[in-house]
Amino acid sequence: VQLAHGVGEHAGRYAELIAALVADGYSVYADDHRGHGRTGMKQHGGDVSKLGRLGPGGMNATVAALWQFTQLIRDENPNLPLVLIGHSWGSFLSQMLLNDHPEAYDAVVLSGTALRWPGSMNGGDLNAPWKGKDSSGLEWLSRDPAVAQQFKDDPLTTEVPLLKLFGVIEAAKLFGRPRKHLGRD
């Protein structure tokens, strides 16, 4: 299983899922994407204020790095099926990978996703439905307040919105059309 996390977070936030999959006999690979988590801290010289920023090459370099990770997984496990799980921004990256390399994955699971067409993705305030005087701003993340608190307390996450992190040009690269005639079961 290859795991692609969402924007502003990191692979470590999926520790429970990874542990459950490993307990069921799966091998799990999860990286911190460019600008995120420990990768982001190293990339930005430990500057936590820059977490989430992709750096040189932007979105294209991020997708290329994720593809390189897929190839490493395939090289280490040539006879095993590969399932790609992408959440939120990771689901958009997964859609991009699937468009370019459909043969590389035996199955794909998209969570918290949308069609990558203008009008299908919400570029606005994801917390708008829960706005109120007592809202934390992270209600969109989970129905469990403890999950929002863990995110807020995690020094390797950022609440900076995607458009501010990436800028309009890089964020626009998330748009695309699904490739026709992808295999399906």
Where are these regions (language model features)?
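Short glycine-enriched nucleophile-adjacent loop
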Residues: 91-102
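Serine-hydrolase catalytic core
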Residues: 142-185
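Alpha/beta-hydrolase active-site loop
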Residues: 51-75
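Active-site glycine-rich loops that stabilize anionic/oxyanionic intermediates
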Residues: 5-9, 88
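Conserved alpha/beta-hydrolase
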Residues: 11-13, 18-48
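Alpha/beta-hydrolase fold nucleophile elbow
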Residues: 77-88
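Active-site nucleophile loop of the alpha/beta-hydrolase fold
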Residues: 109-118
